Amino acid sequence: MSTDDLDFTKTLAKPIPAPSLQQLESASQEAAVGGAHLRSNGYYVAIARRTTAKVPPRDGERYSLLVVEDDPDLANLLGDIFGDAGFEVRKAKNRAEINAEVNKPLLPDLMLLDIMLPDADGLQILARLRAHSKFARLPVIMMTGKAEVSDVKAGLAAGADGYVSKPFKVSALMMAVNLVLGKG
């Protein structure tokens, strides 16, 4: 493994840096909007930051999506949905599999990241990605059962490009993915 690779199987030697005041303020504003949406719809938050330009597929042909989800039924469902939409879908359910996927020669174009994994905290994984030059710009959408305004704020402040709570509408998740990739 080269020094540019991440190793999620090891714990951090130093704490993850806290978000800046600007990141916290921006996340607070976005989370407030998402919280209003949650109250009006009663069950889900769907926030996605539109990119300034279309993100081209890394392989030049089709987008690759890494689904980090420990529920095999949901991971397979997302694999089917996004596969049918033309994405190459890769899956990981724990630290070791995340580690293997992000250290493959061709990075995914986008990651759907659950916060609550059996052996990892998705927010810590996101923070490590954002702190690493190779992965800092990798689009990441948090996909989680945590839908409180404070949860949304924490995800966005940590650098998530989007936040979709479970249970979600497939159309909302697809819209978030397309917005983050600049396809929508």
Predicted regions and their residues:
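The feature encodes the CheY-like receiver
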Residues: 118, 148
